[in-house]
Amino acid sequence: MRYRLVIFDWDGTLMDSVARIVDCMQAASRDAGWGELEAERVRNIIGLGLPEAIASLCPGIDSVRAELLRSRYAWHFVEGNDTPMRFFAGVEEGLAGLHDRGGQRLAVATGKSRRGLDRIFRESDSGRWFHASRTADETRSKPHPRMLEELLVELGVAPQEAVMVGDTEYDLEMARAIGMDRVAVTWGVHAPERLAASRPAFTAEAVPELFNWLQGR
């Protein structure tokens, strides 16, 4: 088995949550008095930690308004928005297959908060598939590789024994920074040509392609 550890991004890679993130960020921006944010700009920052995302979307924003925007985003995401979020078709079966074959550990590295990821784990009963996880509010945000470095130390795996799977250049670049293989998926937020610049070992254009490739490794 080539990879002892497979690390997945969450939003846009495993879960179809992009529309909800965009809606909630746009609503939060209006609530905070910053005005309307273009959907494509919001899509572009998905994967970053929330403070980093706000700083990118709202250059020059003061700390008080940034905190208001952050709190309104959290409210909209948890309580104020009912845009459906579900796993992409085939993801649950693919994760279960990797988990059940044994000998390989699974982890999550996400721009979500710990509270948000744990809530999704509970609601979807998906936490049982993963041996470890890191969120952007408990370590450095992507594209800094610290969350990957911490996962490797926790699970006792070398970078050359692991692979990162994601839909953004932030995912791929943090893996590239520490010499870790990376797999790009094209059903998320960043365009294939943008992902290709990070030189992924494989690019999956459909969920079955991703898990078939991982099963062979």
Annotate each predicted stretch with a short phrase.
Residues 83-86, 113-164, 169-178, 192-194:
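Substrate-recognition "cap/lid" segment bordering the active-site pocket of phosphatases
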Residues 2, 79-108, 114-121, 145:
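Short, acidic loop-to-helix structural element flanking the phosphoryl-transfer center
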Residues 202-206:
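Short acidic-hydrophobic, aromatic-tinged amphipathic segments that line or gate anion-handling sites
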Residues 101, 178-180, 198:
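Structural motif
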Residues 1, 100-104, 155-161, 217:
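Glycine-rich phosphate-binding loop signature in dinucleotide/nucleotide-binding domains
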Residues 46-79, 89, 96-97, 105:
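A metal-dependent, Asp-based hydrolase signature
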Residues 1-44, 60:
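Active-site neighborhood of HAD-like aspartate-dependent phosphohydrolases
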Residues 187-197:
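Short, glycine/polar-rich helix-capping loops at beta-to-alpha or helix-loop-helix junctions
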